[in-house]
Design a protein with these regions (language model features):
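Cytosolic juxtamembrane helix and N-cap/initiation of the first transmembrane helix
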Residues: 1-17
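Core segments of alpha-helical transmembrane spans in multipass integral membrane proteins
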Residues: 17-19, 26, 40-67, 81-89
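Non-cytosolic membrane-interface motifs at loop->transmembrane helix junctions
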Residues: 34-45, 74-75, 101-113
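Membrane-water interface at the C-terminal end of transmembrane alpha helices
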Residues: 116-136
Length: 138
């Protein structure tokens, strides 16, 4: 069970770091210069800030309640499942609508690879906990 806990905490920690890093992305990459209408800059920044706050908060909550996941607390499993669903959604969206690699190849493939990594790190422990929970009920 220890390796699943390590995967869980590493995946949640990377998710938290992505959320915190995302606060700075619009300014690091000069998003405003790519947006043709000045009136859209502030709303896009608001959406990014809200997403960053929610991803960071959800990831931190999942980290802080990690022990409850492995004793199979149902409420915590729902939060964990939601975080996992978010990363699965991210991977699926990237497959359907890939980031154009001509803008920055390493960034495009790095984002996709990182998303798959976090998804796997969170998915494997989730399957393990869910399967032991079902076996426990029988």
């Amino acid at each position: 069970m220890k390796k699943y806990q390590i995967m869980y905490y590493v995946g949640a920690a990377i998710s938290l770091l992505v959320g915190l890093w995302h606060f700075t992305v619009p300014w690091m990459f000069g998003w405003a210069s790519y947006i043709p209408y000045e009136t859209l800059v502030v709303p896009i920044n608001y959406v990014n800030l809200c997403f960053s706050f929610l991803l960071s908060g959800l990831s931190l909550t999942v980290i802080l309640w990690g022990k409850k996941v492995f004793v199979q607390n149902p409420e915590v499993l729902y939060l964990y499942g939601f975080l996992l669903a978010l990363w699965i959604f991210r991977v699926v969206v990237e497959v359907i609508y890939p980031c154009p690699p001509e803008s920055n190849v390493w960034m495009s493939y790095g984002q996709f690879g990182g998303s798959v990594l976090v998804c796997v790190l969170l998915l494997v422990p989730f399957i393990r906990v869910a399967s032991t929970r079902k076996n426990r009920k029988k």
